[in-house]
Amino acid sequence: MRIPVVASILLALVSHTAQAATSITIDAKQNCIQNAVTPGPSYGNSVAFQLAPGRYVMSLSTNTMSCTGGSGCVIDAVHVVGGMGSARWGTTVTKQPTVVDVGSSAPALTLWSFITDDVCADNSGQATLLIQTVN
């Protein structure tokens, strides 16, 4: 019973989003932060972007990311951190719409997006992080 209610709320939020959207490309190799369990330096860098305070719906609109050289190990989520709101300490974004609140009185706040893996070097593909403003 609870899942249909949550799905209905997310669907309602998605249907009330503005026409303008922001798309950010996440690269499975270049934007991969290597897991702290694996010795050695971190592999890639996060993607930084700024959003004005407000409510957003985020999802992966396209995704071809995989690990182990594309041999079936699908990477189906990206992490979003920052914004002084609901993603302040991090949230996971998949193909399912996720509501993210960006708070503060600042005109724009920085958020970062990345994936994590224990071995980033064999990752391939990209995903598009779609960000839509909720009216």
PLM region descriptions:
Residues 20-135:
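Acidic, Ser/Thr/Pro
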Residues 6-11:
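Hydrophobic helical h-region of N-terminal Sec-dependent signal peptides
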Residues 15-17:
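N-terminal signal peptide c-region/cleavage motif recognized by signal peptidases
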Residues 1-4:
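Positively charged n-region of N-terminal signal peptides that target proteins for export
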